[in-house]
Amino acid sequence: MTSLHPAQHLTFSRRSAAALAAAVLFLAGCGEEAKTTAADAAAASKTTPAQQAPIPVGVVQLVEHEALDATVKGFIDELAARGFKDGENIRIDHQNAQGDQATLANIGTRFVSNKSQLIFASSTPAVQAMARATKTIPVVATAVTSFEAAKVVKSDAAPGGNVTGVSNLSPITAQLDLLVEIAALTPNTAKTKPIGVVFNPSEVNAQFQVDRFKAAAEKLGIEVLTASASSVNDVPQALNSLKGKICGFWFPTDNVIASAAATVAKVAAEAKLPVVASDSA
């Protein structure tokens, strides 16, 4: 497979569209009658269901929140724009794991049993589950910080295997500089105080970003205080445990934090603390 696409400056729906470049190539090769050329793929997209059965495509997201919803919508919309329409020449099976790892595993088994010819996975846990479920079905993923750190590819530069996609790694050093600058201008905060980080340590992508953020902060002589939140219910306590000790919050791309965005905003506003986050959900 081709190298992974670093799309940290794209919007989430654009990330899905970028990943589609690989997806269309896979779809063009699906089915006994399909060929690998762009012209043949376009012709195949115009065949009727009576001529060719719709190609089964699995779509899975870890949980429902704005960012992941946008990736799925962008992927499906771009497929349609390129002639691959659900219910016509493809059949999309969209599954939501509701944040449950066991459900993700079951979804992977479902896609394999249903002979999906392509799987689109949104989030790191989702692509990890799909990579465990199949070594042959092409898996295209987005909302993943590092495919290599997630251990679903040999390396981000040369994935190999059946998994590829789009990275959403944020410009961490620039985010740190921005937070320090804002904290220095914010009343009742002091840039000499530590920076607070709340994240789900069981999410590989979140831990990967936090490690990088800590390393960047250490170079500037800035302390980082962390608190873990394994579920949305843990977020308020984790946030409150850092209030009064920090000059501001930084958050990595993290599905738990994204799902609790309203809570994060409320607590930070009440504490009059600036926030810099990798996710806009």
Q: Which residues does each predicted region cover?
A:
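Short hydrophobic alpha-helices and adjacent helix-cap/hinge residues
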Residues: 2-13, 18-21, 26-281
